[in-house]
Amino acid sequence: INNSTFENNLSGDDYINFFRSKNIVITNSIFKNVKNDAIDSDFSDLLVENTTFENIGNDGIDGSGSNVKIKSSKFYNILDKAVSAGEQSNFYLNKNLFENNEIAIVVKDDSKLISEEDILVSNRLDFVAFRKKRFFELPSADLSLTNIKNYLIEHSTKVIGLENIEYSSDIEEKLYGNIYGRASN
């Protein structure tokens, strides 16, 4: 998918959903005024590059059991999570801009995330790491090349790149529209 615009959908859950898909590449595209999730990736391999996400009602990119690379993309005014890595996903983020989002980056449920040189500006939360489903292990993240200012991190979660972490408890109770984010439909 190259040089495409996805905007103003009026109904439905995900604008695009990939299920057990390989070698998906989205470049030079725009997702704008999306009702719920812009991209949902289930058990898929996905590269998103030089793509803009703006005014998204839920998540910008939501992955479960997926391998996702996001490079040189922009996320503005995402009402829940700009990027959400869940259920044993591997996410690599590089040189993205996250601005004025509810939550910029989330890693959960035995997922691994690397963030390199991402820029975070005026997000309600820059980063969240927790275990939502207890049958998964804790997630892990390497944020050593990204400046994270505000976060929620579950105790014992392995996070490289943040010093003197102040761990939080009951993170899930603070998300999904309770304090942060948006309730799922």
Walk through the language-model features, giving the residues of each.
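Extracellular beta-rich repeat passengers
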Residues: 1-185
